[in-house]
Amino acid sequence: MSLEDVRKQNKERVVEAALKCFSVNGIENTKVSDIAKQGGITERSVYRYFNTKADLVLEAALLFWAQSVEKSKKVYARTQHDSLPGTEQIRLVLKAYADQYFVARKELLFIQEAEAYLSRNNMIHLIRNDLPSDFYKGITPLAKAILKGIKDGTVKCSEERAERLYYNSYDSLLGLMQKMANTPADSPSMNPGEKERLDEFCDMLTDYFCR
């Protein structure tokens, strides 16, 4: 393994450790020494790759989005979507995204904290949020599903409105998941059940594409 490969591997290890520490303990309660310990490297090595804690927060946030995109793609690939109409593909993709609430709840709260933290450090513009990426690039499963629906006629709204709904769907679903993650389990808003609430929200978003 070349020296460059070792450095790349070490940097990735630091970012993975940072994401875990920030998600479990919160950004403010996490010290660089905690990240170094989690990653099995020295604190000095962490600073070799990242100048500030804010740089680590940024890279950890970008790692989470990259992982989210890959998970979404895998879910999309595992399901036989080709025979389904576009609107049903939209529904499945949104519900797959909503599943993050159950498997990455702490990470979702980290993202919420990270956006505020990076904003205070004038770095919020550096979040190249891959979810969602540009609609017309058709890279994300949701964009592919919408474009399929436009082509097969199951998406009834205009293409311009479909593009707006694409961004609004991701942002509103993320907001709901973060809100639910911050809500006590005995709150009245949680009575319908977490999965039921998310499923109904995804159904509601899907219906907007049919109008």
What do these predicted ranges mean?
Residues 1-9, 80:
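N-terminal intrinsically disordered/low-complexity leader segments
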Residues 2, 13, 17, 21-59, ...:
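Helix-turn-helix
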Residues 7, 11, 57, 61, ...:
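Amphipathic, non-transmembrane alpha-helical scaffold segments
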Residues 24-28, 104, 152:
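Short coil/turn segments at alpha/beta junctions that flank glycine-rich nucleotide-binding fingerprints
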Residues 59, 74-107, 162-169, 195-198:
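Hydrophobic alpha-helical connector segments
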Residues 69, 73, 88, 121-152, ...:
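Amphipathic alpha-helical packing segments from all-alpha helical-bundle domains
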Residues 96-99, 140, 144-152, 167-211:
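C-terminal peripheral helix-coil segments that are non-catalytic and often amphipathic
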Residues 100-126, 178-185:
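Amphipathic alpha-helical segments used for helix-helix packing
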